[in-house]
């Protein structure tokens, strides 16, 4: 099972609830609750203050997010591959909780908009543009650098 953004969080939630229904999961930039990292200034204020402000302004979504994250942390047993980026405005600076999950392989893609020293671009048949958002790093051609990691993960889950 794999997903990006809210699909990434859904992948984690699915695998925590139904570990016997799929061989594994790959999550890309998990996030379902808006641009929390940027809107609540996580870099400047820290995680605790930012989340307190989010809860004050949006208690229902905050509590649902916390409930889902706790469920994932407490129940996820299958090895999962998760990609995050610190410049992801959604949850890029709020992903450290993934490190608490046994079997989780979290990959912080890069600290900037390059992977392995190469600028990230998206290409079409007759267009090309730089990837300008951390949330979109997995759609850049440079993300192919991680193909061996992904293929090794898939191979490890199909044995």
Task: State each model region's role.
Residues 1-45:
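Primarily recognizes the serine-hydrolase "nucleophile elbow" in alpha/beta-hydrolase
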Residues 2-5, 28-31, 83-88, 109-112:
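Active-site-proximal beta-strand/loop segments in catalytic clefts of secreted hydrolases
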Residues 6, 72, 138-142:
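Extracytoplasmic/periplasmic, Sec-exported soluble proteins
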Residues 18, 29, 84, 154-158:
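Sec/Tat-exported extracytoplasmic proteins
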Residues 28-29, 95, 120:
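A general secondary-structure boundary signal
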Residues 32-106:
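The feature captures the conserved acid-bearing segment of alpha/beta-hydrolase catalytic domains
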Residues 104-159:
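C-terminal catalytic histidine-bearing segment of alpha/beta-hydrolase fold enzymes
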């Amino acid at each position: 099972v794999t997903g990006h953004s809210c699909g990434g969080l859904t992948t984690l939630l699915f695998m925590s609830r139904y570990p016997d229904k799929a061989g594994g999961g790959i999550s890309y930039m998990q996030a379902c609750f808006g641009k929390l990292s940027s809107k609540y200034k996580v870099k400047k204020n820290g995680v605790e203050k930012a989340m307190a402000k989010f809860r004050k302004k949006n208690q229902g979504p905050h509590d649902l997010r916390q409930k889902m994250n706790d469920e994932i942390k407490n129940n996820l047993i299958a090895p999962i591959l998760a990609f995050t980026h610190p410049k992801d405005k959604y949850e890029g600076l709020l992903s450290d909780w993934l490190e608490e999950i046994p079997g989780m392989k979290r990959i912080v893609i890069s600290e900037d908009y390059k992977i392995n020293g190469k600028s990230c671009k998206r290409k079409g048949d007759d267009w090309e543009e730089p990837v300008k958002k951390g949330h979109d790093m997995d759609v850049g051609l440079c993300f192919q650098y991680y193909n061996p990691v992904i293929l090794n993960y898939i191979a490890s889950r199909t044995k």
